Amino acid sequence: MIGLIITAIISAVLIMALLVVAGTFTWVERRLLGFVQERYGPNRVGPFGSLQWVADTVKILTKEDRPPPGADKLTYILAPAIAATPVLAGFGVVAFGDGLVLAPVDVGVLFLLGMMGLTAYAAMLGAWASNNRFSMMGGMRAAAQMLAYEVFLGLSLMGAVMLAGSLSMHAIVEAQRDVWFVVLQPLGAALFCIAGVAAAHRLPFDLPESENDLVAGFITEYTGMSFGLFFLGEYLAVLLVSALAVTLFFGGWLGPWLPGPIWFGLKTAVIAVVFVWLRATLPRPRYDQLLGFAWKIALPLSLLNLLLTGIVVVARSAP
């Protein structure tokens, strides 16, 4: 009973920390976008605008949140929660340091893939419940995109799993003490990062909520706290994909001089900033190009990487 209470307290602290980090990340992103686009970005609330996310949170919480006419109210309310909750649960198996993990399960990678896949249901359910044609089109795009990119997302990380011989996050990091897997798996790392951006619905893969042709996609009819949960889920997904990339390919918490959790945080921040840089510099492709790249290019390359890794693993284990 005491252990359960301690776990609940640690979980609450972790969730609060993640919410603060996600909010701060929105400010960092807006400042970086302003720098790239030669403008200021938020600079009024707090030092250098660093508390802008707090003001935005207060604004979202005080806005009216009411389902549109003809909407399925229960599903409409549940969809935003499904967008954020699985991503928060995914952080429970992330190893932030040696022994610094909330739930040290042996199938952590598999659990994370499952949690990330659930976010597609939020988009589909929210789109269907909104009773809006633009929302429905965005939801169908989200479903097709997740189906395409979730496949080679899993295949791209299997190379690291094969080299480590385990699905445990801790074991994968420990297997990189001699050399990071990004050196042994450059193709797998690149494919994983591409699929991760698509799984998080980030530019240039944000066609499910493309403003140019779908108003706001599957979140067209959402406002207030419901919109905020979708927004939160997206930014948490970016951080989760960054943390997973660091764990699988960039040595996790391993590094000289500094404590492990600091190394993990710095590496994750670098990957997240790269995602922002991609958003600022790359154009949005056509939807047929997006799916064509997934099925015709990325999937065969993932299978090729898996085949080559299997050959190397078998050759290394041969007497």
From Swiss-Prot:
The organism of origin for this protein: Rhodopseudomonas palustris (strain HaA2)
InterPro entries reported for this sequence: NADH_UbQ_OxRdtase_su1/FPO, NADH_UbQ_OxRdtase_su1_CS
GO molecular function (one): oxidoreductase activity, acting on NAD(P)H, quinone or similar compound as acceptor
Protein family: Belongs to the complex I subunit 1 family.
Membrane topology recorded in Swiss-Prot or TrEMBL: Multi-pass membrane protein
Source species taxonomy: Bacteria, Pseudomonadati, Pseudomonadota, Alphaproteobacteria, Hyphomicrobiales
Keyword Cell membrane: yes
Cross-referenced NCBIfam families: PRK06076.1-1, PRK06076.1-2
Role summary: NDH-1 shuttles electrons from NADH, via FMN and iron-sulfur (Fe-S) centers, to quinones in the respiratory chain. The immediate electron acceptor for the enzyme in this species is believed to be ubiquinone. Couples the redox reaction to proton translocation (for every two electrons transferred, four hydrogen ions are translocated across the cytoplasmic membrane), and thus conserves the redox energy in a proton gradient. This subunit may bind ubiquinone.
Complex and partners: NDH-1 is composed of 14 different subunits. Subunits NuoA, H, J, K, L, M, N constitute the membrane sector of the complex.
GO biological process: aerobic respiration
Protein name listed in UniProt: NADH-quinone oxidoreductase subunit H 1
